[in-house]
Design a protein with these regions (language model features):
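Ser/Thr-rich, low-complexity intrinsically disordered segments
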Residues: 1-11, 26-32
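Cysteine-centered motifs
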Residues: 13-16
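Glycine-rich beta-strand-turn "strand-cap" elements at beta-sheet edges
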Residues: 22-35, 67, 71-98, 124-154
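Long, hydrophobic N-terminal alpha-helical segment
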Residues: 33-61
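Short, well-ordered beta-strand segments in beta-rich or mixed alpha/beta enzyme
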Residues: 40-47, 86-122
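Generic detector of contiguous secondary-structure segments
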Residues: 54-67, 102-107
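Short amphipathic alpha-helices in soluble, non-transmembrane regions
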Residues: 57-62, 118-125
Length: 154
């Protein structure tokens, strides 16, 4: 077992020196079976604030297709507390403009094989033609596939 210390807003975090208040110790297993964990597709995009509702409608449409093709879960998060960093940050990563918000999203799949099959179907689906009316600049989207190595609580 490992014991880690978690923090929530208030006292300074040792690594980033941001302010954190409460610290709590959590015990987790020493080994975690990565093979039994899901596969994640992660995305970060800049969306014009004026397009927020259009983005939500767009996401609901396309996220339902991901689920239809095997995704376990899809999460879309509109930036709320996205600070500027000293070296880099989410806004710089997607070249967000003043009138844009950063959206952080992920698609969770049972495993990489399910993801590969689901994404292949997704890209071939005729409903993808509607993506041409995307409410954000897709050229600035960053994305990637990730193997889950820690998932709590499980």
């Amino acid at each position: 077992m490992h014991t880690i210390e978690t923090a929530s807003k208030g006292a300074p975090c040792r690594s980033c020196m941001r302010s954190f208040v409460a610290r709590k110790k959590v015990t987790i297993p020493a080994t975690i079976e990565a093979t039994a964990m899901s596969y994640i597709d992660g995305f970060v995009i800049a969306v014009p604030n004026a397009n927020r509702e259009q983005f939500i409608a767009h996401a609901r449409t396309f996220d339902a297709i991901f689920v239809e093709f095997g995704a376990i879960r899809v999460v879309e998060c509109w930036g709320d507390d996205v600070p500027d960093g000293k070296v880099t940050d989410f806004r710089r990563a997607v070249q967000a403009k003043q009138d844009e918000s950063v959206v952080f999203s992920w698609v969770e799949w049972p495993d990489k094989a399910a993801r590969d099959a689901g994404m292949a179907k997704f890209m071939q689906d005729p409903r993808m033609e509607a993506a041409a009316d995307c409410p954000f600049d897709g050229k600035r989207m960053i994305f990637g596939g990730f193997k889950s190595v820690v998932s709590l609580p499980d």
